[in-house]
Amino acid sequence: MEKILGIDVGTQGVRLVITDDKGNILDEVSREFKFDDGRIEQDPNVWWQSILDCLKNIKTRCDDLVSISVTSTSGTIIPLNSDNKPIHNALMYSDDRSSKEALEIEATMNISMKSSYSLPKMLWFKNNFHEKYKDIDKWVHATDFIIGKLTGVYKITDYTNALKSGFDVSNLAWNDVSKIGLDINNFPKVVEPGTFISFIDPNLSNYLNINNNIQIVAGLTDGCASQFASGAIGLNQWSSTIGTTLVLKGVTKKIISDKIFYSHRHPEGYYMPGGASNIGGDWISKWYRNDELDNLNSYAQEFYPSNDFIYPLLITGERFPFYNSEAKLIDNKNLNKEQKFLAGLEAVGYIEKMAFEKIEKLTGSKIEKIYVAGGSTKSKPWLQIRSSILNKQILITKNPNAAFGAVLIAASKTIYNSLSETFENMVEIKEVIKPDESSVIYQDLYKEYIDWLEVNMNRKDLII
């Protein structure tokens, strides 16, 4: 039996998953980090020590382990010296100290840039740590650092991680970073996710007492890994993840030319556009206790569809599927607790439908089914409400998480010949939800909701 290992380095901890070549999980282990505040910076050596601890505690024997890949946060960057040692903590994706540099890059290089991206963090580091900057030999992403620890090869990254460091995914080349005073020689070689990098470092395999012919392959960002694990791997397939926010990701033949999307490069040559709303599921934990959710879901199951409207945005500003910097919560004080809960579930469904209508118009392709993931999948009535509002099938895979996405990438060029073949053999659909009789009613309610939203926002341009 051939085995595959996926490693996910998250913000709060690491998770390792071992599967067989059919996607069955044989073992998984995790460790939490103990940072006081890891949102701005983290010590990457802590990541590695946590992974080593996990590797030493895996119960399943690794004798038949064929390949390993890694996924981690998108936009996190680490400066290394010539000895491959960090000369500073990892600058995390959630570090927004480089907002000024992001604006400078946009003006100078004419490319879209945000403070959450890694390229402005590099420029910020140069501007604020002059002496340390002189010692930089290479910039590596979080994924690259762990792969370097596994192999001794640090200066290779993948398409998905390189995107936010200034890599042009259309031309497969670095943009001219010399325009902002950075040295391209410090930037890594870029390869497809799943590309063979090296066999495991012999010293590491001896230390762990595992075989030394394990292939380590290029990884990918956690968002892309989760997308693949959710099932959206092939052309015109889309995933929708509702956690704190609503995130849509898909696979298209051509890049989507719209400022509210950014696009990764798919391992098989397609593009992977994504968009993220500020609406999601955060309002549930803000407004309700966990011990209330069973009763609230029971109410929603019994009384949907409703004709109550709210807009459950907890922050100011919306970015997708429409841009409105002044958007804010629109509440309805006349609703009781249960009614407001149901109205919130439906509101997110309406925004999700608006987003997919925008995607269908921009791509010219009809989307028949949607793969879903995130905390929202725990609510059965919400899944049914979303399916009926969208008027599309919703599919849930067995293991829709980033670590399993790393497993799929690890298998895609070692055990199998492509990501598509890997999907056919390793991804299992756990549940399919179809629109029910409420779908007809929801189509009319959706139109009413958009009209209501436009009136309350004093906007007439929400629909493209």
Q: What does each model-found stretch correspond to?
A:
Residues 1-88, 135, 205-218, 390-394, ...:
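N-terminal glycine/serine-rich phosphate-binding loop of ATP-dependent small-molecule kinases
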Residues 5-6, 99, 103-114, 123-141, ...:
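Active-site core segments that coordinate phosphate-bearing ligands/cofactors
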Residues 56-92, 114, 143, 147-168, ...:
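Short beta-strand-loop/turn "lid" adjacent to the catalytic site in phosphate-handling enzymes
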Residues 65, 185-187, 367:
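Core-facing hydrophobic residues within beta-strands of well-ordered domains
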